[in-house]
């Protein structure tokens, strides 16, 4: 690999076999190097191979407009998130999170603090992503010497959710709000307080994360087993009544009708979560 551009001692760009520019990172990778020099492969830590040409072009433009340190911070956060979540995030997050970190760094250096109105909801409903957000604050503190509040951990968690579910940020906000409303319906229907440390509660939240994704994508589970639905609605009549309230809420708010298959999964999860209250 030959250096095409040097951004700093740790970040360069190359041209691949298709003359497509890519970013390469590694400690000291460009030290005492110039354009056209060969890269020491042993120093390569990360090559940004972004398959989407539009995303790649925007990323290359972005890295020319922001401090390279913000790119390094974003990459470390994304790598940590993918390791913890055991998944590959949508590559668009390299754009959105890098840009957000640069914007946030400038804002806080100018004493412009912003609150996240969904902080409490994200802490409760998306703990794994929020904990990644907290780790991100530690990385930002170490690399950029900025002490950021938990509000920023929540915002970074939303970017992680965006990368997980491939949803736009307004949809992520709506997904969080819908999840909160569904939990309220269950809570007040059964007059209970959830055991938020129980495995059944965690599984319910995980189900709701992907249920709300399907809601906004319009990709519901299709009806395959009406007999099982009938059996479970009889076996768990109160959970069924609760799910009917959820169905009405979703129809009244978003105009979407839940399939019996979606209702079946909700009945099962609600029955489990109320058993561990």
Which residues make up each language-model segment?
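A cross-family "folded-core" feature that marks the main globular domain of proteins
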Residues: 1-277
